[in-house]
Amino acid sequence: MTIEILGTGPEIIKNGTRGVEPVIEEVIKNARKEIKIAVYVLTSRALHLIELLADAAKRGVKITLILNARTCRDKEISLKLDYLVESFPHVRVINFRSLKKQLHAKVIVVDRNTAIIGSANFSWGGMYSNYEIGVLVEGNPAWEVAKILDQLCLIN
């Protein structure tokens, strides 16, 4: 099992801590079988990450995005996600709706072996301008996080 601390903000990442966004890019590019993402906010300022997901879909990677239906309403993102779902049968977008709770997680799991868990939304603030902290975990904990995301898919 491997654990690495990630962050955003120049004062945080200058001390050898890797940035959240470059690590997200890296794990998406390295995905071979599956990507699961749960996120509270997804905006067009993170469109490049959606492009990376499109590249992964072209490689045959199964992708599941679980989005908070109340906060993920960016039109440009919606059009791109609709295109991905229509173009690739192995891409699934779940607009999480619950009368009791909101989806507030910010999690990515790749191949059930690598997970990024943190505070950063898929937005300009989350990737660049806010101070965010996250962890990259590899091994069994990533598998456990994937199982939680599987359960979230069933709740909706």
Question: What is each residue range found by the language model?
Answer:
Residues 1-25, 30, 43-156:
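PLD/PLD-like phosphodiesterase catalytic module centered on the HKD motif
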Residues 39:
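Short acidic, glycine-rich surface-loop motifs adjacent to enzyme active sites
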